[in-house]
């Protein structure tokens, strides 16, 4: 069973990489760009036939290692 974890910075927190990128995009002539934010996507393949248990396991991975709960939010979706 495959799951995609999308991790993003929580709203209201500074995103220096996003700010630097938006400045560069403006310098390149993309003046209409209003917001850029960076995150990450992780795909995890779990050898399980129990979807609920696999989802719980992926959620635990996020809480313990993959995401920083102070600065980031995450969502998990089954993709296969």
Residue ranges and their predicted role:
Residues 52-80:
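C-terminal structural segments of small proteins and small subunits
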Residues 31-40:
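Amphipathic, hydrophobic secondary-structure cores in small proteins
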Residues 13-16, 50-56:
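Short, conserved charged micro-motifs
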Residues 12-28:
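Short amphipathic alpha-helix segments
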Residues 1-11, 40-44:
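Short glycine-/aliphatic-rich beta-strand segments at the starts of folded cytosolic domains
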Residues 2-4, 27, 71:
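Positively charged, small/polar-rich N-terminal and surface patches that mediate targeting and assembly
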Residues 8, 28-31, 61, 66:
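Residue-level signal for pocket-adjacent positions within structured domains
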């Amino acid at each position: 069973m495959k799951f995609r974890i999308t991790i993003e910075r929580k709203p209201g927190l500074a995103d220096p990489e996003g700010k630097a990128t938006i400045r560069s995009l403006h310098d390149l002539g993309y003046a209409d760009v209003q917001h850029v934010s960076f995150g990450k996507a992780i795909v995890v393949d779990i050898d399980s036939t129990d979807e609920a248990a696999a989802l719980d396991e992926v959620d635990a991975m996020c809480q313990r290692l993959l995401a920083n709960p102070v600065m980031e939010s995450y969502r998990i979706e089954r993709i296969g």
